[in-house]
């Protein structure tokens, strides 16, 4: 779907002591993403819906780039397998990092509607709830934590802004298919 679904991950809110590790892990996974014709074996991400969508996603990436840093992805320097990059509507996955998400708020307001996400740190669970609410609502949110109390606090605090909340811990994460 190349990030073009209403439940695509747009904002990744991470405890500040884990953000470097999580960013590295996400970048490694994204680095293994093969872009191209989905009928080709090994391709993990196809094209955006239209060339107009490519232009819109690029415009939104340009806007987001004013307040945060791209830590993975390249708007032009990516390979496409089994298709013509110039004829198709292909787009590299982009991962931004926003170290000050309470002051640099574009990531909460701009939805690229493509393979674009922003990773951001929080200090306390209350901060994570507030950051989640700054997105002004979504169809789905997730929390991944081994702490049931923390999960409960997040769900109660963020529920009014999200259609559903997926709670994952080490036991149920193995079974989860995502959103």
Q: Which residues does each PLM region occupy?
A:
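ALDH superfamily catalytic-core signature
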Residues: 1-102, 126, 130
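Conserved C-terminal structural/oligomerization subdomain of aldehyde/semialdehyde dehydrogenase
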Residues: 83-179
